A protein has these predicted regions:
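Active-site-adjacent core segments of small-molecule enzymes
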Residues: 1-223
Length: 223
């Protein structure tokens, strides 16, 4: 499977996964008790919204929401979410969206901490605003009116509980590589473990293929 991502990246001359996106500034305010170690209080974050398959123009796609959460010092947690369903079954299914605030963004697979399985999602607070799924429309919209999300977590019972709010605003004008598998808080891992290893390999091959296409070096494990 990794060779597929590498070949696709070489063909596109960019990463195979989430090739088209926009890095923005944001604020994460974690104010509720949570199983996952979100830092309490308000923190500045970097956010990347992207198209998973890189469909042309404003065609629907599985959209991605990556958030770099500061953990203190030089440590951070790169949380990667994709548009998905909201119930106990569909929360594990990536689903395409016709606009940036059209669906919730979920972790799809759970995190494991102290034996607990925990899913994470970001729910748009304004679903009536239809921002076409292309980076240009997103840049204009975020510059004028910030995007607001409620961050929720859920255990095996399928009940969602609000743990934070996320506000996304104008462009950050930074080239950031998110590392959703390698940048995890202490004591937290992706479940199952084999899927985490597979994602590391997929991201590595995606970036290596793009690097071979343009003659640059790739860093393993980044998205």
């Amino acid at each position: 499977m990794s060779s597929v991502f590498s070949a696709l990246a070489r063909l596109r001359r960019t990463r195979a996964l989430h090739p088209d996106g926009l890095v923005l500034r944001g604020t994460l305010d974690a104010d509720g008790p949570a199983v996952l170690p979100l830092p309490r209080g308000e923190h500045e974050v970097l956010v990347r919204l992207s198209k998973g398959a890189g469909t042309p123009g404003s065609l629907p796609d599985v959209l991605g929401l990556a958030v770099r959460v500061p953990l203190g010092g030089d440590r951070h947690w790169d949380v990667l979410l994709s548009t998905s369903g909201g119930n106990r079954v569909s929360r594990m299914t990536p689903l395409p969206s016709t606009h940036w605030e059209g669906r919730c963004y979920g972790s799809v697979v759970p995190f494991r901490r102290d034996g607990d399985l925990v899913w994470l999602r970001a729910v748009p607070q304004r679903r009536t605003r239809r921002i076409p799924p292309n980076p240009g429309a997103l840049a204009t919209a975020a510059r004028n009116i910030p995007l607001h999300f409620t961050v929720e977590e859920s255990g095996r019972d399928g009940e969602w509980r609000a743990v934070a709010t996320l506000v996304v605003r104008g462009e950050a004008h930074e080239d950031v590589r998110f590392e959703p598998v390698l940048s995890l808080p202490p004591g937290v891992e992706m479940s199952p473990r084999w899927l985490g290893r597979a994602r590391v390999e997929a991201y590595r091959e995606s970036r290596a293929g793009a690097a071979r296409a343009d003659g640059t070096a790739a860093r393993p494990g980044a998205s």
